[in-house]
């Protein structure tokens, strides 16, 4: 088995070596190497020109063409351009090899075992012969895992229990001394009980909550953290956090588990960790990919998997300053470089005209991607994107493809349209967006109906049916939904009477609509369900009171503000005729019940559920309960699919003593409190 592995590897290297000498590929290899060096230099100088994903994609392409290329063996950048004082690391800060699949992780474990067997330190887990004294059966059963933080690596030095130095990773040998800024960051103890000299390694990050609160409009926490960490005036550094993961010198600590525990005892914050077998690591990786990662307040791009024993790590050694006993198990990066063949502009349900890049097909996360969103017209200008450009395309959360950046500029910048692609009405510019304001535009009508259906939680109504009733001219505003007949729906393509009856019965079952739901269903910009609840709790318990309210009056409500108040008043006045028609037809909203089985109780929903969020919200509010948007000390119940979940909301809820329940538990709670 081992010999076959080496033979396969030799064959692959021979094939790839042939690619490296093929004239057709030689130019591309040289171009990739030059660009990788350039981007690596800018990355370690603190002003990256492309994202980590784009850099990884270029490295992967070079590795496929020439796996032995010297550029791939380098760590950091040799060309630091900085005005900060340079400082040398006593122990160089290296990097990690990466794996991006479960098979590659298993391959890494197998290689570790092979090395130990070859050097006489293990039996590879075969049990073929009695182990020699002190030998290792296999590393597979003794692995340690930590979150791989997507931040700025740093060495922090303490002497006599005091913080004395903080040096960025730089090129691995030399970094920049930014001690004054690091001292202001969260997670940095100014004093520790260890009185000798101590060098610890950590990562500067910007928590997503801090980014939202202190740097509105910023989209890259890593870039913002890098900028704040190296500002000469230190501004913004206080909002950054440092999480620690390593001790660099002199301590006789036997395992990674003990190392992290010791760091925590000293007062250093660390990323979350786990210990187990390779099977446990794979399960944890899957959980992070599907659930845990999305619930974190900071960005990670994978897990770091260590052989837990530091003695065994030492036996495994390192290659090119990369330890063999640890590996970065990166989340499969659903991003690839491709070429833009066209740019198309689509009018969405809100009236926003969104640019879409039509690209050369690429396989991403199991899907063949030909279209990728460009967000808005301002982003087109910011990217400077045009037809012919080489771009990095990703599938965020393995769902929507986006153009993340221009990797190589080749064509003229795209020019946005001046009229709506659907109805040809003139477009208006509002901030970053191009908007169609034609109320008769088919795209906007569909959008208003979609919003109404989603807000009231009418599960039977799918996208296709909404498109059909709008295209047939049967529906132009929400009131028209309540005028439909079984026959009018059944006559539509592939619709039957049974399906039509279900759709209409569901509409009626949602009546009467709670006032917050009614207001949110109108789809007025800035008028989400939480804002609607805020208004009702402030005493605006009827639609008539709200229609009579002025901007100044609403702006005085805590948590609302002048801008949102103005948007609400404008939106209500613009839709007053439509609201009047709904009221005249008997679709009159009611204030949430002051009494009911859930009166005085608060609920928050998280994760995917068996029923739409709107339906669950309606259930709680019609039973007298209140729905909160986040976990607070005020929350009574967190409704979640798995009450044993370790998501951030679940953890926070347990901390506050909030009870975690399932949707079935919610139904039982209502029945019990009704006395049924």
From Swiss-Prot:
Claim: DNA damage is one of the keywords in the record: yes
Keyword field: DNA damage, DNA repair, DNA replication, Ligase, Magnesium, Manganese, Metal-binding, NAD, Zinc
One record GO biological process: DNA repair
A Pfam family the protein falls into: DNA_ligase_aden
Protein EC: 6.5.1.2
CC cofactor: Mg(2+); Mn(2+)
Tree of life domain: Bacteria
Domain BRCT: 593-676
Residue numbers binding NAD(+): 52-56, 95-96, 169, 203, 330
PROSITE patterns in alphabetical order: BRCT (PS50172)
Residue span of region Disordered: 1-23
GO function terms (MF aspect): DNA ligase (NAD+) activity; metal ion binding
Active-site residues from the entry: 148 (n6-amp-lysine intermediate)
Biased composition, class Basic and acidic residues, residue ranges: 1-10
Binding annotation for Zn(2+): 420, 423, 436, 441
Matching CDD domains: BRCT_DNA_ligase_like
Catalytic reaction list: NAD(+) + (deoxyribonucleotide)n-3'-hydroxyl + 5'-phospho-(deoxyribonucleotide)m = (deoxyribonucleotide)n+m + AMP + beta-nicotinamide D-nucleotide
UniProt similarity note: Belongs to the NAD-dependent DNA ligase family. LigA subfamily.
Function: DNA ligase that catalyzes the formation of phosphodiester linkages between 5'-phosphoryl and 3'-hydroxyl groups in double-stranded DNA using NAD as a coenzyme and as the energy source for the reaction. It is essential for DNA replication and repair of damaged DNA.
Protein name: DNA ligase
Biological source species: Sorangium cellulosum (strain So ce56) (Polyangium cellulosum (strain So ce56))
